[in-house]
Design a protein with these regions (language model features):
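Flexible, glycine-rich terminal cap/loop adjacent to redox cofactors
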Residues: 74, 87-94
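A cross-family signal for key residues in well-ordered alpha-helices
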Residues: 24, 56, 86
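Short amphipathic alpha-helical face segments that pack within enzyme cores
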Residues: 77-85, 122-126
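Short beta-strand elements
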Residues: 46, 51-61
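A short interface-forming secondary-structure element
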Residues: 59, 68-75
């Protein structure tokens, strides 16, 4: 993709959308990449615009996020939001993250967004919430489950 800029300003969009805070996180993202051995990982995409985000977390035995990384592709808003989210959630407990709300995520971006751009901004938040939900579900033990006997026909 040589010759293509990493970021293209749409002349039809207000400069307010491309606030320095967003541009800084888009051009120099925090923890963009992969963890060697994440505790949990989840991916999602926005089918309308094609944004994709994978979030990888390293969670301590005390249920605290010690490292958060992301990777993906998409618009400046979705990728900057993922960077901001990773920076924000490190050091937070899973309980604190369960209480983290979408409005708080939007406030971290420091720009006003249209409804369609909010979907881009909240993609990584959605990935985080889905991951937290899956962590709350009890795991099914693989080796302790006895197979269910096949039904027999009564004679």
């Amino acid at each position: 993709m040589a010759g293509f800029p990493l970021f293209h300003r749409n002349p039809d969009v207000s400069d307010e959308l491309y606030d320095d805070h967003i541009l800084d996180h888009f051009e120099s993202p925090y923890h963009k990449g992969h963890l060697d051995c994440p505790t949990c990982s989840h991916s999602d995409r926005n089918p309308i615009c094609g944004d994709q985000v994978t979030l990888e977390l390293l969670v301590s035995d005390h249920h605290v996020v010690t490292e958060a990384y992301f990777h993906g592709k998409g618009c400046a808003i979705s990728q900057a939001a993922a960077s901001i989210l990773c920076e924000t959630i490190e050091g937070k407990s899973l309980a604190e993250l369960r209480d983290f709300q979408a409005q708080q995520m939007l406030e971290l971006l420091k720009v006003r967004l249209t409804a369609s751009r909010q979907k881009c901004a909240l993609l990584s938040f959605k990935v985080l919430k889905t991951m937290l939900y899956s962590l709350d579900q009890p795991a099914l033990p693989c080796s302790d489950v006895e197979p269910t006997p096949a039904p027999t026909l009564a004679e």
